Each structure stands twice: as structure tokens, then as C-alpha cells.
């Protein structure tokens, strides 16, 4: 028997290259992941009669042993375990579904929050638009009311200012409408006497159905007119109208 074959039979573990081939292809990651690796399958030697004939016949068929270590060659229970717990850590894509799943729910609320933000913004815009319009309309209405009130005040002030001269002119225009008979009697009396006594003024007022004031005012106006036309008489030495003195002296004056 070949010494190399006997040493291989005596040792439970094959040489380093043989042991690396028999191990799981993903066994390098077992050290990092901490998962146990499956024991290698026993060697299968080809028993030949002419063993020393060829040197290669003494070595086992490593291809079969390496294929036996694959998950497809393992028993069903071990295959399920390897499928559930792979020995070699997967690529970063293995974490992608989890991160994607985490991102998806996060993106859902984020998207929802964005949608809610946009919807809230939309609601604010839709509700704020008419609110602003109402505020603008209210301000314009207040401005129009203020302007109208100012215009009313100005118009009322103008009317009052206009009404005052009109009232004064009306008061001035309110003159006694003497009849022809009254004017005839007054002219005849003025031709005889430019100044009237208190008693004579009272008699004329009673006869013509006038007041003493009306008679007095008429005679004053008539004297002013006569002075403008004729030059009139000189003023009395006392510098006072005789009617005024008479009326002031009489107790029955106005």
C-alpha cells in the first residue's frame, strides 16, 4: 500500500487544500457570522485491484466529495437550515429589502406628510384666498363708508355755509309789502312832516293797520332817500333824530 494513501486513511482530516475543497463554499464567512459549518462527507476511495499501477488512483475522488458538500447534496433538514441560515454573509443587497421596507413605511408617512402639507397648504390657500378677498372687500367697504361720510359732512358744511348767506339775504329781503293806499297815506304824511312824534306814529299805525316799527322804519328809509336826492335838511342841533328822542322819552315806546 502506498504510504501517502495510508497516511490519508489514518488522518481524519485531509490536507489543507483538500479540506478547503471539502468545506462549504461559503464557509469562509462562518467565522464572521458565527454559524456552524456542516461536517464534510466521508471520502470515497476507488478500490482497484491494481492499486500501485497508477499514482493517481490512490487519491480519493475529490470532485464527488466537493459536490456532496453543496446544499443540493445535503439531507432535507440540513438543506432547509442552510436555506434559512446561509453561512456566508450576503452582499449588501441582502439588507436592501429591509432598508427598502423601512424606507417605504417612512416614505409613506413622509409622502403623506408632504401630501398633507400640500393639502394643508392648498386648504390654506383655498380658505385664505376668500378670507383675504373678504378682508380686502371689508377694507374697501370701510374706506368707501369713510369717504361717503366725509362727502356728506363736506356737503352738509357747504350747504350750511351756503344757507347762511341765503338766510341772511332772506332776512334782508323780508320787507313789508305796503299797499298803494298805505304808501299814499305815508307819502302824504311825509310831505307834511319829515319826523313823526310818538303819538302821530301810533295814530298812523292804527289807521293803516301797521305796526309802529314798520311806520318808523319806512320814515327812516324815506328820509335817507330824500337826503340822497335833494340834499335834505340839516341835522338837528342835538344830532339826534326827533323820532328817536320822542320814542325814548315816551314810556309806551317799544
UniProtKB/Swiss-Prot annotation:
One of its GO terms (molecular function) is sequence-specific DNA binding. It is found in: Nucleus; Cytoplasm. Its main location: nucleus. It comes from the Eukaryota. GO terms for cellular component: cytoplasm; nucleus. SUPFAM superfamilies: Homeodomain-like. Residues 87-178, 227-254 are annotated as: Disordered. PROSITE patterns: HOMEOBOX_1, HOMEOBOX_2. Keywords: Activator, Cytoplasm, Developmental protein, DNA-binding, Homeobox, Nucleus, Repressor, Transcription, Transcription regulation. One of its GO terms (biological process) is somite development. Residues 171-230 bind DNA. The keyword Protein biosynthesis does not apply. The keyword Ligase does not apply. Residues 154-178 have a biased composition (Basic and acidic residues). Mesodermal transcription factor that plays a key role in somitogenesis and is specifically required for sclerotome development. Required for maintenance of the sclerotome polarity and formation of the cranio-cervical joints. Binds specifically to the promoter of target genes and regulates their expression. Activates expression of NKX3-2 in the sclerotome. Activates expression of CDKN1A and CDKN2A in endothelial cells, acting as a regulator of vascular cell proliferation. While it activates CDKN1A in a DNA-dependent manner, it activates CDKN2A in a DNA-independent manner. This is Homeobox protein MOX-1. It comes from Pongo pygmaeus (Bornean orangutan).
Amino acid at each position: 500500500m502506498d504510504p501517502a494513501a495510508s497516511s490519508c486513511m489514518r488522518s481524519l482530516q485531509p490536507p489543507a487544500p483538500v479540506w478547503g475543497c471539502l468545506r462549504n463554499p461559503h464557509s469562509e464567512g462562518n467565522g464572521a457570522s458565527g454559524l456552524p459549518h456542516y461536517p464534510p462527507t466521508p471520502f470515497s476511495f476507488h478500490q482497484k485491484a491494481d492499486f500501485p499501477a497508477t499514482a493517481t488512483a490512490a487519491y480519493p475522488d475529490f470532485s464527488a466529495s466537493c459536490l456532496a458538500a453543496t446544499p443540493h447534496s445535503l439531507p432535507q433538514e440540513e438543506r432547509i437550515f442552510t436555506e434559512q441560515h446561509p453561512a456566508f454573509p450576503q452582499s449588501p443587497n441582502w439588507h436592501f429589502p429591509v432598508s427598502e421596507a423601512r424606507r417605504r413605511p417612512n416614505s409613506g408617512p413622509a409622502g403623506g406628510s408632504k401630501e398633507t402639507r400640500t393639502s394643508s397648504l392648498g386648504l390654506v390657500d383655498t380658505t385664505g384666498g376668500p378670507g383675504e378677498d373678504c378682508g380686502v372687500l371689508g377694507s374697501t367697504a370701510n374706506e368707501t363708508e369713510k369717504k361717503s361720510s366725509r362727502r356728506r359732512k363736506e356737503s352738509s358744511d357747504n350747504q350750511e355755509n351756503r344757507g347762511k348767506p341765503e338766510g341772511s339775504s332772506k332776512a334782508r329781503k323780508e320787507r313789508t309789502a305796503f299797499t298803494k293806499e298805505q304808501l299814499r297815506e305815508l307819502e302824504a304824511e311825509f310831505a307834511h312832516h319829515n319826523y313823526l312824534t310818538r303819538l302821530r306814529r301810533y295814530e298812523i299805525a292804527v289807521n293803516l293797520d301797521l305796526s309802529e316799527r314798520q311806520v318808523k322804519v319806512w320814515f327812516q328809509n324815506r328820509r335817507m332817500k330824500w337826503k340822497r336826492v335833494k340834499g335834505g335838511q340839516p341835522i338837528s342841533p342835538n344830532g339826534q333824530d326827533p323820532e328817536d328822542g320822542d320814542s325814548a322819552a315816551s314810556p309806551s315806546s317799544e
